[in-house]
Amino acid sequence: MGKVIGIDLGTTFSCVAVMEGGQPVVIPNSEGTRTTPSVVAFTKEGERLVGHPARRQAIINPERTIMSIKRHMGTDYKVKIDDKEYTPQEISAMILQKLKADAEAYLGEKVTQAVITVPAYFNDSQRQATKDAGRIAGLEVLRIINEPTAAALAYGLDKEGNQKVMVYDLGGGTFDVSILEIGDGVFEVLATSGNNHLGGDDFDQRIIDWLADNFQKEHGIDLRKDRMALQRLKEAAERAKIELSSAMVTNINLPFITADASGPKHIDVNLTRAKFEELISDLVESTVGPVKQALSDAGLKPEDIDKVLLVGGSTRIPLVQETVKKIMGKEPHKGINPDEAVAIGAAIQAAVLAGEIKDILLLDVTPLSLGIETLGGVFTKIIERNTTIPVRKSQIFTTAADNQTSVEIHVLQGERPLAKDNKSLGRFILSGIPPAPRGVPQIEVTFDIDANGIVHVSAKDLATGKSQQITITGSTNLSEEEIQRMINEAKQYEEQDRKKREEIEIRNRADSLIYQAEKTMKDLGDKMTQAEKDEINKEIENVRKALEGTDVEAIKAASEKLSEAFYKVSTRLYQQAAGSANPGGSQGTSQGNVYEADYKVEDDNK
């Protein structure tokens, strides 16, 4: 069995890790950094860029650059580039493909299996969409695990004794809080809560709005309507936010941000930490509710928690740390890297599934209640939130009208009392019920949640034994045909990327060969015949011409000819130099590494 990798597929950054020699290791990407921006771009020439290259060109190509796609997972949102529409699953798959390729380059072997993390508060549609993205990228997703749980695994791998731990996970786009009990290799989630639309992106937006509103007051121009100016504002806002984690004030300087009839306009302002905290205070305060909810669900008080772990880049913000300290009455633990802990935890779980680690048991929970719609549009819960998974529960229902021969099962997820206020996961019909007065038939509805948190539902008429079951595939999820089409397209992109890399390598080798040949002629030109020089110069020129074109095979062929000509001359010169150094040969005078000797010109054309 090959290596199973652990992937933190984040809103703004992603990270991949693997177990090596019993220790989790974060895998650097091809650019040399340990986290990869979750950014995909398409150049006007149709080339696809992922990660740092995509992020770098965002200012000049904002319309064709896709960021924070994770926020749209499990929805019917589509991104249109030229005439093609992309689903969030496809864009996420491109990020996963990049992480997979980096892992393969690091490990020196093919990678086909992964554990991928999701926010604890992701619903069924979002989890299924993540699994589909993995398949499109060519990965068998062995397990979907919750991000706070993964972070707790990273923290608790080498800890002894029983501890109650709270994980406060505030990333680029999502917020989760989970409470776990850790002891003797068992990681049991007691409760989880969160907000799928809160994170660093929202803090950036507050700075963007502050800058844009002030600029509009002064100049009467709304920069948010100019895509290129808005992208510059986004990058400046993120930079300012990061700097204010360590500095009390930062300067935002954006020359030539726009222009009007009176000339170019610039932004040059200072943002203090106090002002930034004022801008985001309500967002940070909104994390307090889920923390209290999780504590209440776990039946614990803040003083019962032994350690508070901060995960996600946004927890570096001093106001966030102060808020957590205020609620919990203790300093948060700083011993884990907030950007890498989730990927490390995923790698540990991957090693557990691969059989490399034997003494760890992970008991996670379902974040939201599951049930069905019953008479009057009421939501009847079958599995309560924070139930340990995997789990299977059944409940008996009956018909609402006389002689009813079929029932529609409407599956829902959420906490609201009315069906219409909860997330619809799908519907199916159980037919063939024998006619009977209402209230007589007995229909058993069974919910089954697997270890990935993905839901399977069945309904059975106890009188006839007829049953109907579905794995939830809501309206936003992809059909098998769509997934197969996307897998094939992803392979085409992979092939394009491979060819592009190959072309770059061939061009680099050709450049290097020209440099080597020219340097040799410069250093040893007085030892070469004019015919040899002419031959090499001719082949150098052929390679240069080939490099100007797009025919990779022509570059290869020209490089091979230059290589042959160069090799022939080099071999002769080295043999001659070696011969002159032998006793009994011509006595040359050694000058450093250059040997002078008499030699006879052999004309190859004779």
Curated annotation (Swiss-Prot):
InterPro entries per UniProt: ATPase_NBD, Chaperone_DnaK, Heat_shock_70_CS, HSP70_C_sf, HSP70_peptide-bd_sf, Hsp_70_fam
Compositional bias ranges of the Basic and acidic residues kind: 597-606
Chain intervals for the UniProt region annotation (Disordered): 576-606
Induction: By stress conditions e.g. heat shock.
Modified residues (Phosphothreonine): 174
Keyword line: ATP-binding, Chaperone, Nucleotide-binding, Phosphoprotein, Stress response
GO MF, one example: ATP binding
Domain of life: Bacteria
Alphabetical list of NCBIfam families matching this protein: PRK00290.1, PRK05183.1, prok_dnaK
Protein family: Belongs to the heat shock protein 70 family.
HAMAP family linked to this entry: DnaK
PANTHER family in the cross-refs: HEAT SHOCK PROTEIN 70KDA
Job of this protein: Acts as a chaperone.
Name of the protein: Chaperone protein DnaK
Gene transcribed to yield this protein: dnaK
